């Protein structure tokens, strides 16, 4: 992972691919969900994590099929979230699993490492997943995740965020400790917002026009200075 890449490449609204992961939450969108995701794809983040884990599995399967196709159109990686059976059904070897789910599935793997793969049976691992993300909240979590075969992780929450009201952020020292403890890419999550050219954050209110705004990610430099590969954005991406 080249952590020296710049966030921008010629355009203020072309996010450098290695730096930003977009996290979805359809409940935050003012536009139709697929329309909003197309706007996100036009920013060319490193990946979009389809984190609609409150959906029934059949509904998620249908949505995932459409989102994977949309992401392919824009050459953006789509990471499915939690629904491991959906990933297998769609033969889509890119998934983000909460750490307890990752650990549970690894226990079914005789070799003890999910990245050695799975066939279409969740009990039979045979070279299936190419990218496995997980979420960590301590250095111990991070070390465990790497041992379990995660290929990247999100760590947080780093800054104060409405998504975690009442919970103090873990801060930049925590992020640096996580980054120092593992070899795989770490993406900071929590309180990382998009700033538009009028100095407001995209998470404050949805854009009221169809044109893509000029944007920046003010806190990205801070997290990358701690050794992170980049940052994750939910609210801002669902309202850009």
Each predicted region: which residue ranges?
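Active-site mouth loops of central-metabolism enzymes
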Residues: 17-32, 131-135, 192-197, 209-215
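Glycine-rich phosphate-binding active-site loops on the catalytic face of alpha/beta enzymes
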Residues: 99-106, 154-166, 194, 213-240
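N-terminal amphipathic alpha-helix/helix-capping segment at the start of soluble metabolic enzymes
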Residues: 1-35, 111
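Catalytic cores of alpha/beta
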Residues: 78-93, 137-148, 184-188, 192-200, ...
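Conserved, mostly hydrophobic/aromatic
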Residues: 22, 48, 87, 145, ...
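N-terminal active-site wall of soluble small-molecule enzyme domains
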Residues: 47-111, 124
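Glycine/Thr-rich beta-alpha phosphate-binding loop at enzyme active sites
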Residues: 90, 94-99, 104, 133-180, ...
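Alpha-helix-loop-beta-strand connector modules within alpha/beta enzyme cores
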Residues: 63-79, 108-109, 125-137, 168-191
């Amino acid at each position: 992972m080249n952590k020296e890449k710049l966030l921008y490449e010629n355009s203020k609204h072309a996010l450098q691919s290695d730096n930003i992961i977009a996290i979805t939450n359809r409940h935050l969108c003012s536009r139709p969900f697929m329309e909003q995701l197309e706007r996100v794809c036009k920013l060319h983040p490193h990946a979009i994590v389809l984190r609609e884990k409150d959906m029934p599995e059949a509904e998620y399967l249908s949505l995932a099929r459409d989102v994977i196709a949309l992401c392919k159109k824009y050459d953006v990686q789509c990471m499915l979230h939690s629904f491991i059976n959906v990933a297998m059904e769609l033969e889509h070897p890119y998934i983000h699993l909460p750490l307890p789910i990752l650990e549970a599935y690894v226990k079914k793997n005789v070799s003890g490492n999910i990245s050695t793969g799975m066939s279409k049976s969740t009990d039979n691992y045979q070279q299936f997943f190419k990218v496995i993300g997980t979420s960590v909240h301590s250095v111990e979590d991070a070390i465990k995740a790497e041992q379990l075969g995660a290929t990247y992780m999100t760590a947080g929450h780093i800054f104060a965020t409405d998504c975690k009201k009442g919970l103090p952020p873990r801060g930049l020292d925590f992020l640096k400790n996580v980054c120092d403890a593992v070899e795989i890419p770490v993406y900071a999550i929590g309180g990382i917002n998009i700033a538009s050219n009028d100095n407001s954050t995209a998470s404050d209110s949805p854009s009221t026009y169809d044109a893509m705004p000029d944007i920046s990610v003010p806190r990205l430099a801070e997290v990358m200075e701690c050794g992170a590969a980049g940052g994750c954005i939910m609210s801002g991406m669902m309202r850009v």
